[in-house]
Amino acid sequence: MPNQEKMEKAIYQFLEALGENPDREGLKDTPKRVAKMYIEMFSGLNQDPKEQFTAVFSENHEEVVIVKDIPFYSMCEHHLVPFYGKAHIAYLPNDGRVTGLSKLARAVEVASKRPQLQERLTAQVAQALEDALAPKGIFVMIEAEHMCMTMRGIKKPGSKTITTVARGLYKDDRYERQEILSLIQKG
């Protein structure tokens, strides 16, 4: 569980280390605001993305299910600055086992609300889906802009990083994987 008081003290000291006066008018409530913001932004730390799949149904559906353009934001664990973008999730049900569509978005939400790497985020979403449904195939694609590349260092705003995880049929069958990519890329 996050310790808000400890976070506030650390942020206060950080402002002092910058040469700022944390007690001045514009900054006096900043340690509290920043601590509350980080508690919200890292609220996925004590949650398991797999636990978001609370609704699993047996349906007579054996074709692909795709939810795309799921917006998310996360925090780069290397610099503690945001990266944000869209997640696309596809799965091929096994024995008609499907989940509520919002559960896919909830899994992305939980996995992204922690200090994170995009590669790990992609894998965690795929693993949660695999654990919950054991589908015949899984394909997760995440496209994101990283503020650590936009605001600092190389300073390349607008550049996107794309990560994918393919499992089951979508890993083993190149044709099936290409079909999923085509469906995701359609407007």
Curated annotation (Swiss-Prot):
Tell me which residues bind Zn(2+): C76, H79, C148
Disulfide-bond pairs as recorded: none
Keyword Glycoprotein on entry: no
Uppermost EC category: hydrolase
The cross-references to InterPro entries, in alphabetical order and at most eight, read: GTP-CH-I_C/QueF, GTP-CH-I_N, GTP_CycHdrlase_I, GTP_CycHdrlase_I_CS, GTP_CycHdrlase_I_dom
Q: Gene Ontology cellular component? A: cytoplasm
Pathway membership, UniProt: Cofactor biosynthesis; 7,8-dihydroneopterin triphosphate biosynthesis; 7,8-dihydroneopterin triphosphate from GTP: step 1/1
Catalytic activity field: GTP + H2O = 7,8-dihydroneopterin 3'-triphosphate + formate + H(+)
Q: Name one GO biological process term.
A: tetrahydrofolate biosynthetic process
> Which GO molecular function terms does the record list?
GTP binding; GTP cyclohydrolase I activity; zinc ion binding
Write the Enzyme Commission number(s) for this entry: 3.5.4.16
Q: Which UniProt keywords apply?
A: GTP-binding, Hydrolase, Metal-binding, Nucleotide-binding, One-carbon metabolism, Zinc
* Domain of life of the source: Bacteria
* Subunit organization: Toroid-shaped homodecamer, composed of two pentamers of five dimers.
Q: Which NCBIfam families match?
A: folE, PRK09347.1-2, PRK09347.1-3
Record-stated family: Belongs to the GTP cyclohydrolase I family.
Could you tell me what this protein is called? GTP cyclohydrolase 1
